Regions:
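His/Asp/Glu-rich, glycine-adjacent segments
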Residues: 89, 97-290, 299-306, 428, ...
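A long, amphipathic alpha-helix that forms part
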Residues: 42, 262-288, 301-342, 418-419, ...
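Short, structured active-site-proximal loop/turn typified by the sulfatase FGly-forming signature C/S-X-P-X-R
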Residues: 43-92, 151-155
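Beta-strand elements within well-structured catalytic alpha/beta cores of enzymes
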Residues: 27-39, 58, 84, 143, ...
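Bacterial Sec-dependent N-terminal signal peptides
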Residues: 1-26
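Substrate-binding rim/cap in mid-to-C-terminal beta-strand-loop elements of soluble/periplasmic
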Residues: 373-411, 485-529, 546-548
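Secreted, luminal/periplasmic, and some membrane-associated catalytic domains
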Residues: 50, 67, 76, 98-128, ...
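Non-catalytic, well-ordered alpha-helical segments in soluble enzyme domains
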Residues: 56, 136-145, 396-433, 514-540, ...
Length: 548
């Protein structure tokens, strides 16, 4: 027995030495790159068109987690960014969508809108933003709490893409105001705009880009990985009669700057990279003894992807150009922060479903659920059964009930939910329907229900939640326009399977094929930064990233 304990003691000693030797030295700077709407397959579908210093450099020299999945629904931008940076799912961090129906306000609210904040750099509503709906700490919050002198800078074209990654303690979160055509922030983060941001804004880059033409970077016939240019599945950009190259932005604007049009082009990615580089130099990121954190979210891929779909030449060209922006960013990081002095991760907030009409024409599973007619009929059925209008709203496949009226009339809420669930189950394209009771009290091992449950917050989500069959999208009504373009939000692989690559200091070259959940990113950063887990983190560290 004594010998046994001696052996254990020796083994424990070796283990302790091993762990001590593996203590990670934190990088000078962590760079989190989130690409808004990127399918995993783009890394390989467009690989032959990529340069050697962008995506390929990350893939060939970093740790590539090839089976990274979202483990909840809905797969939207707000929840995606929040889950990446909190390391937990919407049921904990509270961001259940880009918008949801607020029962108290009686209206739909944006996930980062804050009526108590005001814009810095703009007088428009676009400045009234903060992370006040975010109920959990981010890894960037944790870094600032542990090391108060560390800087966190976050930026995106979209407000939510900047605000949620930067968290509650960001030193600067900036997003693009499509009214003024400039980067702005809010009173939540700043009392006044930093001098360097004002200087950058004064250069009016978006106006200059709107005088240019978006044409393919390569010869049109080289885009063999995509559908023909003039595709029936693509939406029209304002000022254009066909969804085809070239896009003469000056002609399309017709004399008036259209900053929404600007964000629908690859130039918005270039503009964001310019801003990121300016922040590295002006905020002196990675230049002192404490680790800093730079959050960058490229929004243009999502805007272009919604309009044209994943098999469009527009999307392929955008990614070929984005590859060059990634290469430029890495070059600037190596120049200013130093090679092997920063750690970078690249992922996406969601992927995307192919245009359902494209799937139908290819004789593949897919289709549309047209909500308007179904909801009108459902309203009538509910009134007939219970004698009152009990449905307040539908948002993101959630049915919100008038709980006050139900309670006043002394109708069983469960009875109303079950009645509605049975009707919705008969709608074309509906796969599953769940009541709030089923989701709150769920103990079954049902992967679809579990994914919905992890995205469900009782006081924010609806009373009945439904999911569609693979390849289906919800639309308001049937029309030629509604069958063009695409979206995301489902529990299926085309929406949940995203890239995840780690690169830089402390990262070795390897491929990881086991399943990684998106919530594991923050759990891994905890050990790269040597900080406490953020308060609600449920993910697990990716050991392959941390091991040499």
């Amino acid at each position: 027995m004594v010998k046994f304990f001696k052996v254990l003691f020796v083994l424990f000693g070796f283990l302790s030495i091993s762990i001590a030797q593996k203590k990670v030295e934190s990088p000078k700077l962590v760079v989190g790159i989130v690409i808004d709407q990127m399918c995993y397959e783009y890394l390989y579908r467009f690989e032959s068109k990529f340069s050697k210093n962008g995506f390929k450099k990350l893939m060939n020299n970093g740790t590539h987690c090839r089976n990274t999945q979202y483990n909840y629904v809905p797969t939207f931008t707000g929840p995606g960014h929040a889950s990446i940076y909190t390391g937990t799912t919407p049921d904990n961090h509270g961001i259940i969508g880009n918008e949801w129906f607020d029962r108290n306000a009686g209206e739909t609210v944006n996930c980062v809108f804050d009526s108590t904040a005001y814009g810095i750099g703009t007088d428009s509503q676009n400045g009234k933003c903060s992370p006040h709906y975010l109920k959990a700490n981010t890894i960037t919050d944790q870094l600032r709490m542990t090391y108060p002198s560390s800087k966190v800078i976050s930026m995106s074209i979209k407000d939510r893409g900047a605000i949620l990654p930067g968290g509650h303690l960001s030193n600067g979160s900036y997003w693009f105001d499509n009214i003024t055509g400039k980067f702005v922030t809010s009173s939540y983060f700043k009392k006044e705009m930093p001098f360097w941001v004002n200087t950058f804004n004064e250069k009016n880059y978006p106006n200059n880009y709107l005088n240019q033409t978006w044409n393919t970077l390569l010869l049109l016939e080289e885009y063999k990985e995509s559908e023909p240019d003039n595709s029936p599945y693509e939406q029209l950009l304002q000022g254009k009669l066909t969804p085809t190259f070239p896009y003469d932005l000056k002609e399309m604007c017709k004399g008036q700057p259209n900053f929404n049009l600007f964000t629908s082009t690859p130039f918005a990615n270039t503009y964001l990279t310019d801003f990121a580089v300016e922040s590295i130099y002006n905020e002196m990121l990675g230049q002192d003894g404490q680790t800093d954190f730079l959050c960058i979210s490229y929004s243009a891929p999502d805007i272009v992807g919604h309009a044209f779909g994943p098999y469009s030449i527009e999307m392929e060209d955008l990614y070929i150009r984005l590859d060059l922006e990634i290469a430029r960013l890495i070059k600037e990081l190596e120049k200013k922060v130093g090679k092997n002095q920063f750690t970078l991760f690249l992922t996406a907030d969601h992927a995307v479903v192919p245009v359902p009409q494209y799937l139908l024409d290819k004789k593949l599973p897919g289709g549309y659920l047209f909500l308007e007619s179904n909801l009108i009929q459902l309203d009538e059925e509910v009134k007939s059964e219970f004698g009152a209008d009990l449905i307040l709203s539908e948002e993101n496949n959630n049915i919100y009930l008038d709980r006050e009226t139900i309670d006043f009339l002394k109708i069983g809420r469960r009875d109303v939910e079950l009645f509605i669930a049975k009707r919705i189950a008969n709608w074309e394209g509906v796969k599953n329907v769940y009541t709030s009771e089923e989701l709150i009290n769920s103990t079954t091992d049902n992967s679809w229900k579990d994914m919905i449950r992890l995205g469900y917050v009782p006081n924010e989500s609806g009373d009945v939640v439904f999911m569609l069959e693979p390849g289906y999208l919800p639309k308001t009504k049937d029309s030629e326009k509604s069958r063009k373009g695409t979206s995301h939000g489902s529990a299926f692989n085309y929406d949940t399977h995203v890239p995840l690559i780690w690169y830089g200091k402390g990262i070795s070259k390897k491929e990881v094929f086991r399943r990684i959940n998106i919530t594991d990113i923050t759990a891994t950063l905890v050990h790269l930064l040597n900080v406490q887990k953020p308060n609600a983190t449920t993910g697990e560290p990716i050991l392959e990233v941390l091991e040499k």
